[in-house]
Amino acid sequence: MRKKSKEYNSNNKINSLIRLNKYISNSGICSRREADKFIEAGVVSVNGKVITEMGYKIQKTDIVKFNDSTIKSQQHKYLLLNKPKNYTSSFKDSFKKNSVMALVRNKCREEIFPIGKLDKKTTGLMLFSNDNDLTKKLTKKSLKIKCIYHATLNKNLQDIDLKKIKEKRWDDYGIKITDIAYANQKDKKEIGIEMIGPTKNVIDKIFETYNYQTTKIDRVYYAGLTKKNLARKESRFL
């Protein structure tokens, strides 16, 4: 019995190990790739010993220093917000009353940041996290993220223009429209548009190409996430 207990404790110790670059990334300082560069440069120490070995593993109780300052790893948080209209999404405006940061700042102890941005008039899904690796991944221009928007126009969208929008190549904007349809056949000002690629500010430009103006834009789907059961201005952890 004692032998089994010893093996169990040993396994627990192994399972509790974490890669040094991940620990640094979890602290919010940088991404894992950037952490590797700092480790290689010799500015990271563990329990007083400089570590330059790639793939080095530590225990969470170890003392890790970056440029002689102790850092602490933190748990990753992921928060989904249904952004209201007239709120800014820039982190630079985080202390303004109409900033999305004012809506999420007190949701957790960890400091979380918006992943991507929506312009002031656009409503809908926004993701917040302290996960640097995920943030860098989702904000890469080369990454093809699927989004669905509900747009309201200033006038009915003609069938011929809907077809043109769907068939046109939008390479200049770095996006691909995979589907577009009337959200309501009785009101052709209400449009659902599905696209892949970076989408900030492109909805306006798409419709302006055919002399339409958007009066409302709502992001209803983002990277596999929906706003089901999430009221405007409300948020929830994933």
State where each predicted segment sits:
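Basic, flexible Lys/Arg- and Gly-enriched helix-loop patches that mediate nucleic-acid binding at interfaces
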Residues: 2-238
